[in-house]
Amino acid sequence: MITIITFIYIILSLLNQFIIIYGMIPVQCGYNLTRRIPVCCPLSNINGKVCGGPKYGECIQIWTPKEKVPSVFLIDDRIDWPKRYFTYFCQCFGNYFGAACDECWFGWKGKHCNKRSIKIRRDIKTLTDRELYIFKRLIVLSQTWPSGYLLIDESDNWNVDPLTKPKLEHASVQYYITYLHRYGSRSTLYKNVQDCEDYGILNFNHDGVCFPIWHRYYNLLWERLMTKIAIQVFGISDYATPYWDWIGLRHCDICTNRYIGAPGRRSEMGLHISSGSPFSNLTEYCYEPMKDLLCSGCQKGGKGIITREFKKGNLPDVEDLKFVLSLKQFHVPGERLSPVCLSFNIALEGFCGRPGADPNHRWFHNKLHVLIDGSMCCTATASNDPLFILHHIFIDKIFEVS
């Protein structure tokens, strides 16, 4: 799969060029957005210069590829991203990164971002008590720790376009992370039911060639934000997020209070996490009273408390893993209409699988979300559960060895 590795390298290199793809709206650029000034080129925290100055980056007009898009999608602010927000951004030089080119690109460190940074991700069940405490503490702190980003209020579909001076709100790390996952997966915010039913089909981070690549970058962003907390609270600059190896398990063996929380009380929202876990009252951002509601933004349903249903069922086993890894074609156009599983990408995500492996058509990555259920059920809320990042770091590990 050498060609796929090359493709991923090209994609990530392009992401490094224009930092608005890093997330939503950097706090430093909120003023300009509300006044329809199309420039997001902040001052560096290192030297106070725009984009860090000539050694770090420069403020330039962004170029985006032109694609033929059906007119029904043109109201979507994600089309021709990110030009509905800004047209001028910092282009960082070398390994510099960040909204103002004052950070290092992933895998690099040092004053000049020229030293390799190696992080080792490990199975959560191999962590020491101290390491496990740090992981849990970072999750809890991320609920209130400032992310440095502003989010657009999508509580209704009438005032979300950046051209209409939308309401912006500051976001904690966890709120930002959940919003970002929802923003990438939600359908277009149409203003009437008929358009929604007819055209509410877009999903930019699932059910397609983008799934593993988008989530790899997402994991890196998340890990970077947690590292920033770890530096200030624990003095740890090389924090690496653990993963959960669930291959061949018959139940969630880390759904205990030692790890990510045992089952607790039940309410009208569902089965909550045990009060003996620090995760028992984690906020469920982008809460959805009705699962997978089309044409609705993150704030439509308000906030809840995370839940898990812990459904019974075998998780994918070694034979399922071997089947996924045996598929050497990364993507096969039109495969979703085929009864045969042909590509690694779609098998990894779980829209097809080993013949006869699951009569309920629940495979690999998707199967875990279905069995855990609760907050993990849906793209809007899944990333609120700490289990999400453990699961997706493991999926990324499989992607890496493919």
What are these regions, as identified by a protein language model?
Residues Y22-F93, A100-F106, K111-S402:
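C-terminal accessory segments of proteins
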Residues M1-I19:
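Classical eukaryotic N-terminal signal peptides for Sec-dependent ER targeting/secretion
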